[in-house]
């Protein structure tokens, strides 16, 4: 579920229905209590999506699952709405009449299936000009281990006329999950577990901060946020309207066996990590600054 509050209008809720396959739907509400009927956005055999809201505009990007198998997830699509789902359009403004049911349609950003690449959705944001920027990891295999390499953190950016693509870095697992932060026209950040962790071929790794000073054209590793960890870290999520001192939130754990799993957060600079208490002794507890 991905609910978005549109000031003065209400909620637009983007979500998945498991109808035998994973299909995308939306509904809307003026107050979060009374909801419209569910309406299907896409049913091309199955999808996963990531979305974002700015003002009255809600943007979403998603892959497709050939024959309903998420292990074969591929291709990349984009749609947006400015009226709580009353109408939908592509990045170039072409109107779309949902639901999407055919793989080849105007919302298709790139046909990764033809390249033999799988697509794992990570995040979406809007640049300083309001153009969508999508973050994905592409892979050669759904299984963990070296067979899927290279696993490429990829930026797909609409430049006003066409989609442009660029590589950020490479990863060790398809489910390495991070977030994109577009702070100005030139300055972009990614916080993600891109560095190998103690469980090398497992989900996650060591958390890192990547920075671009040229609007996503090139990237550099600014800082390793975690080091020498006992367990892999992953699923760094960007809080809505993130405060500079609470810029990314994630968990750790051993992906191969049962283990403790703790919650962490970092600041905008990625130069400190706090761990939440595993046991709350009172209503309020201080987070623990990691050494």
What does each model-found stretch correspond to?
Residues 1-291:
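Extracellular, repeat-based ectodomains that mediate carbohydrate processing or recognition
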């Amino acid at each position: 579920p991905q609910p978005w509050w549109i000031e003065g209008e209400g909620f637009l809720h983007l979500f998945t229905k498991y109808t035998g396959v994973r299909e995308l739907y939306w509904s809307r509400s003026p107050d979060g209590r009374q909801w419209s009927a569910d309406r299907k956005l896409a049913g091309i055999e199955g999808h996963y999506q990531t979305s974002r809201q700015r003002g009255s505009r809600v943007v979403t990007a998603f892959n497709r699952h050939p024959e309903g198998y998420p292990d074969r997830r591929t291709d990349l699509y984009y749609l947006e709405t400015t009226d709580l789902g009353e109408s939908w359009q592509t990045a170039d403004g072409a109107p779309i009449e949902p639901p999407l049911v055919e793989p080849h349609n105007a919302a298709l950003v790139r046909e990764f299936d033809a390249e033999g690449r799988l697509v794992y959705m990570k995040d979406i944001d809007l640049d300083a000009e309001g153009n969508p920027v999508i973050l994905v990891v592409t892979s050669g295999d759904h299984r963990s281990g070296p067979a899927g390499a290279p696993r490429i953190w990829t930026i797909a950016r609409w430049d006003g006329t066409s989609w442009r693509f660029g590589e950020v870095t490479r990863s060790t697992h398809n489910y390495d999950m991070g977030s994109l932060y577009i702070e100005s026209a030139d300055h972009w950040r990614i916080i993600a577990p891109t560095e190998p962790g103690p469980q090398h071929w497992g989900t996650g790794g060591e958390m890192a901060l990547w920075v671009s000073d040229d609007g996503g054209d090139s990237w550099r590793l600014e800082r390793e946020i975690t080091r020498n960890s006992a367990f892999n870290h992953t699923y760094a999520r960007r809080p809505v309207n993130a405060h500079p001192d609470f810029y990314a939130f994630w968990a750790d754990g051993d992906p191969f066996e049962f283990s403790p799993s703790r919650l962490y957060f970092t600041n905008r600079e990625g130069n400190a990590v706090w761990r939440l208490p595993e046991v709350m002794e009172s209503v309020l507890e201080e987070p623990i600054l990691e050494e």
